[in-house]
Each structure stands twice: as structure tokens, then as C-alpha cells.
Amino acid sequence: MSRRRRQQRLERVLGTPALFATAYGNVGSSIYYALGVVAVYALGLTPVVFIIAGLIFACTAATYTEGTVHYPEAGGSSSFARHAFNELVSFEAAWAQMLNYIATIAVSAFFVPHYLSVFWAPLRQNPWDIVFGIVVIVLLVLLNIVGIQESARINVFLAVADFATQLLLVLLGFILVFSPAVLKANVQLGVAPTWSSFFLSIPIAMLAYTGIETVSNLSEEARDPLRTIPRAVLFVAIAVFAIYFTLPWVALSAMPVHHVAGEYKTLLALPPTEHFQGQHGYQNDPVLGVVNNLGLSHAFTHVLQIYLGILASTILFIGANAGVIGASRITYAMSGYRQLPLGFRKIHPRFKTPWIALVVFGGAIPILLTLSGQTKFLGAIYAFGATFSFTVAHAAIIRMRMQQARGGIEIPYRSRFNLRVRGVDWPLFAIFGGLGTGLSFLVIVIQTPSIRYAGLGWLLVGFLFYVFYRRRVIHAPLTETVRAPIALGPAVALEYRSVIVPVVWRRESEAAVDLACRLAVERRGSIIALTVIEVPLDLPLDARLPGNVEDRANDLLDEARAIGDAYGVNVIGRIVRARRAGRAIVDEAERRNSEIIVMGAPRRDRSGPRGPIFGGTVDFVLKNAHCRVMVAAAPRAA
């Protein structure tokens, strides 16, 4: 096997780990701020709250797995809502997601200086934490405009280091400070915490699962979504549960709740400006608080402080960057569906990045949130958007199952568990998850006036703008899906930036990939090499087929990628299971809003009986594609 082929096979094996690492880097980073924010409300019941929120997260992860496998496109709950309901519901879900990303950027950037305060103490207090947080946001926006890309290998390394560090703290904590007696004494039911604070802490704990949307956003780059996405989500869930079901017990054992002057206090929930028992509060750097209260030697504690300060700030920086990328991607997608003006799709002439979307939603608005300097507000505003969009996602999956029962759609993957009643496979995970997130949303709206006005105001402003834009500018119904037109014409005839190339085991495919690379190379375009596995009607779409079909499909995509490497063009491989190859090609091109499909076809002898000129699949694509189609006919045999 050639060196190139060995390297490509290694990269293919790293598909699921890379997807897991990126998702865990976003979800796992939230432990560095969620622990302190939740403790403000839950006090001694913080571990119980994380368990309850974890069960809701498990249901939500199952929902996102099924929806993303079915519709492997960026958008998450917005995409699910578009297919299950209509464009108006999709917009509201997307607008709530936008709030999630904005809050993620603000809260992650704000907590970076607090962990770096191990090097300079003023960073943990105003105004330096706000100033440094704003600098982080500005730097991330500039880096994303220039187009700096993350390395999958670095993400894997950081995810492993992050998980190993958190696991080490858990093990040390259980050995040195864990005490069931202390944990029991921490709780005064109905008093510390009060019932209202306890119920409010559950939606706030959703902050701990920041980044589940990342899986959906990365699905477009996953080679085989049906296989890699469920595995990656499962690994993320296991890793997250392992930490969130253990570290809070250690934290409350190390920093117990005390009754002082009529108030119940724990260092874990106090802001850094307040002091208790000779220490400042650790609300804004809770994991550092765990390190400082494990009872380790001064030298070992100091080493751990420095190591954790560097690691946590790096993970939070990457988490904030994921928010910036997510905000720009969802803005770009919303513009593509005419939910926002096309100006947000404007690409920088030099760097080819959506710079307006990055500046507005990745920079300006997060900076406004950061100026508040209130971690409780930042956490609650994220919980508002998250519970709303999660509830829409659960409802969309339930709706899809009902459509499937009526024969409207075919679902390639079903998450567990399900209950079949009257011909419908009701998704129990979506039902229970929807109840959990829906009730959590109501709790936030009812109990927190500031979030009620800010969150509902955000949704209302977005809705009013959407109505105005749709009726006065687009002149389209609110519920109709409208795609942005693809720029076609003499001036841009050869400026193809998104090319779909179906590949099969014929030399015509090699000619098609070669032609596509020549079209894309001048404009830094990307190519989607698509291979369709046609599944017989008597088998489910996720059935394993005989004859090493999947291995052959992966080999095809490796060959296409090798051709792209020779041209310096990024080739993204995608395996799709479908009943008909032609329909799958058309759907994939429309989903990605591709500008052209390049297909290889054999030359046919026209002296025989009449039939399709290039073959049934090519003719179907020519008749039904929403974009241009170019056919690369193979040269005649000598």
C-alpha cells in the first residue's frame, strides 16, 4: 500500500475521534464556568442538579443524533424545524441558536482571564477581566476573518489532555476530600437552596452542555454521518457524564456550604470580590477552586495551578472560537434561506470569509454582553436560548416520526428508546427531553425578569424583522422555504466555489474529479466527492450490505482526495445511503447549495435502441438539479 493511501486510511480512522474531540472541546469546556454559576443557585444540591440536567442532555443528544443523521447539514434545530414544520419555526429556532452562540462567545471569553489570573491576580476582577475578554473576542474575529483553521490533531490532543486532567482531579478529590457526611450537611431542603432557586438551577445547568450544536455543524464534513455521528455523540455523552456526575461531589466536599450570619455560603459560589475563610470566591474559576482546596502540598498545588490555568484558558479560547464559527455559519445559512439579508453572506474579497457576519454576530453583540460582567446573566441568557432551541428540536423529531408513519419520509437512523402506538414509533427520548427543556424554558421566563425581557425581546425583535424582510423585501410567505439564488452568468461562469462530484468505479469518475478540480482551483473552491450506496427497498437504509460495499466506497473517496491533493484543492468525501443515486445526488447538491454538479459518463453508441444518452442517473440529475450540471464524457477507447 502506498504511503499516500496509508496516510489517507489513517485520516479516515481519525474521523470519529476528530469529531468527538471537537464536540467535547466545546461541551467539555463548559465545566470551567458552569460549575460556579450553577452553585450560585443550587448550593449543596449542585451535584443533583447536574445529574438531572445530564438526563435531559442524554435525551437531547439522542434527538440531535437522529436529526443530524437524517439531515446532515449545518443548522441543528433550525434545520430539523425546516423539514418538520416550516420556515417560520426554523427562523425562530435559528434566532435562538444565534443567542446561544453569542452567549457562548461572551461567557467563554470572559472566563479566560479568570484562569490566567494565576499569573496576574488583577485579571480576576473588573475592569481587567472585561477588557481581556473583549480582547479575546476581537482577536478571534480577526483570526476567523483571515481564515485560520483549527487542526484536528490539536483538537484531539487538547480534548484528551482536558479529559485526563479533569479525571485526575476527580480521582484526587475522591481520595483526599470526598465526604458523604459533608455533602449531606451541605443541604437544607427548602432553605439552602430554596425550592425556587433549585428549579431555576436546572435550566441554568444546561450551560454545562454548551456545544451540542457543534455535531450538527460538523456533519457536513463527516464522511459517513450514519456511522460517525452516533459514535461521536455517544463518546461525548460518556465523557461528559463521567465528569459532571463526579466533579461536583468533589467540589462541594472541598468547598462545603457554611451557615454564616444568617446566610448559606460556599466558596464555589462566591464572586472573586468576596472573601471567606481567607480565600476569594471561585464563582468565576471554579476548577481552580477545587485545586486550591484539595489539601495538596504548596509546591504541587502551585504546579497544578499553572498547568490548569494554561489548559483551561486554552480550552475556553477554543470554545469561544467555536462560538464565533457557529455564529458565522448559522448567519450564513440563514441568509441562504432568505431569513436574513444577503449582505451577511458577503465574502471578504481577499480572505473568502463571511466577514460581516463575523463582525456583527461573532464580535459586536458578544462584546455588548461581555460588558455586563455578570456571570449569572450570561449563564441565564444562554439557558434561555438553549432550552428554546432544544425544545424545537425535540418537537421536530416527534413530527418527523409522525410523517414517517404516514409514508411521507424515510428515517435512516432511529435513536433509542421508542414506543410503537397506532403505527407510530414514538421517540420516548424526544418526548421526555422536550418536556424537560420546555419546562426549563418556562421556569427561566417566569422566575428571572431580566432574562424574560432580554430573551423574549430578542425573539420578538427577530420575528418583527423577519416579517418585514419576508413581506417587504423578499415578497414571500412567512412559512415558505426560499433559497438564495446562485450567482450564474458570464462574469462568474468559472467561479465555482462549491462543486459536487459523484464518483463510481469507472474511469469516467476520475475524469470528472479532474475537471472539477480545474474548475475549483482558481477560486479556492471546495469539492464534495459523493458516492451513493443504493440500498434495496426490502432493507432499512442503515443495514450492513454484503461485499465490503462501505470499504469500496471509502477507497473511491480516497482516490478522489488524492486527485484533489495534486491540484491543491480541498476534497470532502461523503457517503450517502439512498434508494436511488440520482435523487441522492440532487438532494445533496440542493442541501449544500452547490453551484455545479460534475458527473462522469461513458460515451454511448447511438446506433442502437433509443435510451438515455449518458445513463439513467445522469439524465435524472440533468432534469432535476437546481444548479448547473456538467457532464465529463470519457474519451473513446483506442
Q: Residue locations for each model-derived region?
A:
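Helix-loop-helix junctions that connect adjacent transmembrane segments
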Residues: 5-6, 123-127, 156, 160-305
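Loop-to-transmembrane helix boundary motifs in multi-pass membrane proteins
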Residues: 11, 87, 127-134, 223-244, ...
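Membrane-interface loop-to-helix entry segments
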Residues: 129-179, 192, 233-237, 379-393, ...
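C-terminal membrane-solvent junction of multi-pass transporters and transport-like membrane proteins
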Residues: 154, 343-355, 390-445
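A generic transmembrane alpha-helix motif of multi-pass inner-membrane proteins
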Residues: 376, 380-386, 420-477
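Small/aliphatic-rich secondary-structure junction motif
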Residues: 488-547, 563-565, 569-572, 624, ...
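Glycine-rich, Arg-bearing micro-motifs that act as flexible, cationic patches
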Residues: 599-623, 638
